[in-house]
Amino acid sequence: MNIFREACRWICNPTASKKAPSERLPGGIDWHCHILPGVDDGFQEVKKSLEMLCLYEGAGMRDVWLTPHIMEDVPNETTHLRQVFANFQKQYQQDFAKRNPADRKMLRLHLAAENMLDALFEKRLKANDLLPLGEDGKLLLVETSIFSAPMNFHALLERIKNKGYTPVLAHPERYLYMEKRDYGKLKLMGIKFQRNAFSIDGQYGKKVQKRCKWLMKHDMYDMVGSDMHRLSIFWQYW
């Protein structure tokens, strides 16, 4: 696919989108993405990240939560992420001013993190060295391995709550070890669920798609994120 040609098509005709932003990401808010460049397995180049934000503007988005991974395999320091975010925010402001689009509004960018529930997270939680989600800083985006939960999964979620945070479980539809009753138990604990926007389209396969539909049917999701790692995902599924 010629990304430049597709970008021109989008910019000239934003209504060419398959889905309105309110359908894909309700309220024009992306609660989970990997657009912050060069910090994890997501976007690597500032240029590509800026292109992604330009596309989001054209789609009518309002807020974007940049949520890079923090885990033992990707041990991002919160101080480093804050600095990268501050620099990127300046680059975006400069890019927007240079483009000066009369019919668009600048996106509001926010920094949080997607936290793997592992030994590193337990250390960070104890030290309160975290990047929470939400305007009031009371939400904490967490994930587990796709294949198995940590042995102390529920106890760790309770520890998060005791620290004053509400855990938000990223893409619960993707966890192969979870059964319907597991989702119910988590909701009874007060855990919020964040759906990946393109799970419903089969991005992760039919089993995940089916689980996503079931969770939607039972109104278990609280927020939606793109989990965007690269531009091609936008063109394929939006």
Question: What role is predicted for each listed range?
Answer:
Residues 57, 161, 216-217:
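Non-catalytic positions within long, well-ordered alpha-helices that form the structural scaffold/packing
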Residues 2, 75-193:
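Extended substrate/RNA-proximal surfaces in nucleic-acid metabolism proteins
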Residues 33, 69-70, 114-115, 172-174, ...:
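Active-site metal-binding loops of divalent metal-dependent hydrolases
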Residues 43-45, 73, 148-149, 175-178, ...:
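Acidic-and-aromatic substrate-binding clefts and catalytic sites of carbohydrate-active enzymes
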Residues 31, 67, 142, 170, ...:
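Active-site flanking residues adjacent to catalytic metal/cofactor-binding acidic residues
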Residues 191-202:
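His/Asp/Glu-enriched short active-site or ligand-binding loop at hydrolase and phosphoryl-transfer sites
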Residues 1-104:
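An N-terminally biased module of ancient metal coordination in phosphate/nucleic-acid-related enzymes
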Residues 69, 218-236:
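Short acidic/histidine-rich active-site segments
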